[in-house]
Amino acid sequence: MSKTLNIIWQYLRAFVLIYACLYAGIFIASLLPVTIPGSIIGMLILFVLLALQILPAKWVNPGCYVLIRYMALLFVPIGVGVMQYFDLLRAQFGPVVVSCAVCTLVVFLVVSWSSQLVHGERKVVGQKGSEE
């Protein structure tokens, strides 16, 4: 019985902490003059708490595992909502595909440039001139 209560406590604590960060983000978003989703601010709060080790990762791990495990199921309502606008998407299919392709290319270029900036040029092992 004690083990069962311990597992229930771990899941309860994890979800309470995740939801506390979510509602803190929603509250902060309501105070800001710009429109930023509260869920994004909540994720940033959770990230900062975990990165600074204010909040131990093992406290939120059980809840995160459950959410990640069933993540595909959480996208079903979004997909149904998008299908309500199918006619609009069909009419604007070309611009949507072009914008997705351009955005993908821009992200690829920015990531490659920033990776080159951070890591610099590295010599390949066995390449001529790499023996010094």
Curated annotation (Swiss-Prot):
Domain of life: Bacteria
Record-level GO cellular component terms: plasma membrane
Keywords, in A-Z order: Cell inner membrane, Cell membrane, Membrane, Transmembrane, Transmembrane helix
Membrane topology reported for the UniProt record: Multi-pass membrane protein
InterPro entries: LrgA/CidA, Uncharacterised_UPF0299
Subcellular location: Cell inner membrane
Parts of the chain that traverse the membrane: 7-27, 31-51, 63-83, 93-113
The family this protein is said to belong to: Belongs to the UPF0299 family.
Entry protein name: UPF0299 membrane protein YohJ
Gene name for this UniProt entry: yohJ
